[in-house]
Amino acid sequence: MVLLDPLADALSIIKNAEAVGKDSCTIRPASKLIGNVLKVMNDRGYIGDFEFVEDGKAGVYTVELIGRINKCGAIKPRYSVGVTEFERWEKQFLPAKNFGVLILTTPKGVISQYEARENNVGGQLLSFVY
């Protein structure tokens, strides 16, 4: 089986595990991008702790779920967003103002739209979580 978008697969695994009420889930294959997105989700309080486990291949992330995710997904295509355009994309992908988070990749790394506003930096949209 060929994975065309590992980030989208990882987010759908998390969403489906949350929907059936599981306490944890396993994401494979692991990558730096997925790890950085999980870190942002952890910092914003959507997931519990996560850890990388080496399995002799690409590795595995074990994620502790806390029941805070209603929906999450990857944004395709990866739209480029300037600092002044965040509100437009929040209206498109998030259900209400100040509810949920957009995750984007910037020259400063993978961060949320709130941190991007503080740092006055734009980037490309990766995913949304609420």
From Swiss-Prot:
Listed Pfam families: Ribosomal_S8
Function, as annotated: One of the primary rRNA binding proteins, it binds directly to 16S rRNA central domain where it helps coordinate assembly of the platform of the 30S subunit.
GO biological process terms on file: translation
Gene3D superfamilies: 3.30.1370.30, 3.30.1490.10
Gene: rps8
Assembly description: Part of the 30S ribosomal subunit.
Family: Belongs to the universal ribosomal protein uS8 family.
Gene Ontology MF, one: structural constituent of ribosome
GO cellular component: ribonucleoprotein complex; ribosome
Tree of life domain: Archaea
Keywords: Ribonucleoprotein, Ribosomal protein, RNA-binding, rRNA-binding
Annotated TM spans: none
UniProt name for this protein: Small ribosomal subunit protein uS8
